[in-house]
Amino acid sequence: MKLEGTELMLEYVISTNTAYTQHAISYKSNGLTVSGILNIPEGEGPFPLVIFNHGHIPASIYTRGRGLRREQDYLAREGFAVLHTDYRGHGESDESPDTRMVYDAGLEYAMDSINAVLAVREAKLPKIDSTRVGMLGHSLGGGVTLNVLTSHPEIVNAAVLYAPVNSDAWENFTRWRDEREEGDRTREALGTREENPSAWDALSSLTELSNLRAPILLFHGTEDSDVPEDWSDTLSQRLTELGKEVTYIEYEGEKHEFIPKWKDFMEKTASFLHQELTPVDPS
């Protein structure tokens, strides 16, 4: 996976309040311009960085920073610098140069997510501590997060998976992409899992879970009709078998986006990130 994150730009201020300032940003991801938002808390800092990976929203209706606005606000008020990447092809970002319409299981988006961290590090913003990095991914963004954690485990210190898609790319493909034009082109290029298991393994974080280093906080609702809860059941079990640090929280009755349990979800998320991203006092 080629990685080059550079030229972070704070383009303009979207809004400001007593807790944080929200900036429209752009950065270069492998030479492409990718847009997003960055919430920087008030105060001296430096504040830990949390990257947000959003779920699937059609590019035709997507707008800058869309998808996790409540969560962006909450964590910024908790003292985290929150960078929400739009991904290539979304918001004000450049389009992907790959026009084959072959399913890639979010690997390009994972590049954009990692490159966001690298761009912040290059920029050396005085109020952001980019050596302490958390990541939060919802749905598709949960899959993007798993791709980051398994391909470049040194990048992220702690991760929150919010109703994530499957770690097996074939399962995601057959559930959402197989009936589209992309499905036909993908089958032509890669075949099925039975025909070409190595190709599908290469797209799947499932086969690389042993690489994972960061502690994970995993959430899923029992009434999620978009992403089956048993996918997270299986992921939690597999991570536990591998000896990885995972905490799995199931919310009875919650759907794909939490409502009654949202406050509890965010309190647990903030507590986890504070614990994992706070520097250890050497004294």
Please name every model-derived segment:
Residues 212, 218-220, 224:
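Short beta-strand/loop motif that positions the catalytic acidic residue
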Residues 118, 142-153:
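Short glycine-enriched nucleophile-adjacent loop
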Residues 102-124:
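Alpha/beta-hydrolase active-site loop
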Residues 3-44:
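N-terminal cap/lid segment of alpha/beta-hydrolase-fold proteins
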Residues 45-47, 55-94, 168:
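Short substrate-entry loop that stabilizes the transition state in hydrolases
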Residues 59-62, 157, 164, 168-208, ...:
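Mobile cap/lid helix-loop segments that gate and shape the active-site cleft of serine hydrolases
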Residues 233-236, 240-283:
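C-terminal catalytic histidine-bearing segment of alpha/beta-hydrolase fold enzymes
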Residues 126-138:
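Alpha/beta-hydrolase fold nucleophile elbow
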